[in-house]
């Protein structure tokens, strides 16, 4: 369901592209350093957007550097890391884990079960670090799953539930920006859900999987 919030490369300036890539690579390195390769493969462009947004808003002290990786073994890539990349890495792993749990319970995807087992020990610490967010995300994913099982056809209701999950991710701190960030996360989450439903509708109909647009 993720991967829709990406940069428009043909329209972006070189310096802005370099800035974007540095935060993307920074989040990638953060995931690897905190959670190993199992965390690193959960990297998404959507969470990179969250990093850039929150970094621009809060302006935390940002560490700049460069590094090589498997994807770029020869040329070093610019990297930016800060407290926002740490938070985003945590949220990325937390959300990935509980989404895998739901995929296993709903569709019995063996790959989802295996991945959730790998992340399980790491997520226990995150549950303690972010108890309110963890409970909220679990509850909302469970509600989303139940509505899918019941064949809910109100796409706005379904999208709204996913929007509430994203608003939890966007609300980094309880401060003057919280309400605005929650609202932004909510509507962006709805947008992501709607795009995903539209993209998958033909395949879901063919495979007899749930999709709120399947009977339109």
Model-derived regions: residue spans:
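Conserved N-terminal diphosphate/IPP-binding helix and adjacent helical/loop segment
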Residues: 1-80, 129-148, 155, 159-160
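Active-site alpha-helical segments that house and flank conserved acidic catalytic motifs
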Residues: 42-61, 65-81, 87-117, 180-203
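Alpha-helix capping at helix-to-loop junctions
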Residues: 98-109, 128, 132, 171, ...
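Active-site helical microenvironments for divalent-metal-assisted chemistry
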Residues: 102, 140, 144-147, 168, ...
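Long amphipathic alpha-helical segments that form oligomerization/scaffold cores
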Residues: 108-143
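A mid-sequence, solvent-exposed acidic-amphipathic segment
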Residues: 151-155, 159-195
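Active/binding-pocket-proximal capping segment
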Residues: 201-202, 207-212
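Conserved small/polar residues in nucleotide/adenosyl-binding loops
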Residues: 216
């Amino acid at each position: 369901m993720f991967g829709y919030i990406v940069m428009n490369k043909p329209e972006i300036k070189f310096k802005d592209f370099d800035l974007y890539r540095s935060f993307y690579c920074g989040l990638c390195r953060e995931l690897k350093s905190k959670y190993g390769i199992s965390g690193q493969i959960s990297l998404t462009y959507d969470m990179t957007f969250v990093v850039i947004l929150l970094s621009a808003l809060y302006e935390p002290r940002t560490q700049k550097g460069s590094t090589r990786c498997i994807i770029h073994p020869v040329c070093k890539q610019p990297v930016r890391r800060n407290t926002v990349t740490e938070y985003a890495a945590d949220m990325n792993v937390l959300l990935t884990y509980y989404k895998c749990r739901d995929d296993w319970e709903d569709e019995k995807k063996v790959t989802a079960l295996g991945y959730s087992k790998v992340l399980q020990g790491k997520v226990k610490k995150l549950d303690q670090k972010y108890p309110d967010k963890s409970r909220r995300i679990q509850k909302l994913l469970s509600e989303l799953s139940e509505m899918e099982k019941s064949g809910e056809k109100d796409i706005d209701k379904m999208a709204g539930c996913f929007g509430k999950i994203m608003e939890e991710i966007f609300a980094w701190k309880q401060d003057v920006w919280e309400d605005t960030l929650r609202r932004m996360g909510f509507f962006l989450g709805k947008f992501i859900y709607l795009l995903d439903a539209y993209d998958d509708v033909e395949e879901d109909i063919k495979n007899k999987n749930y999709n709120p647009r399947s009977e339109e």
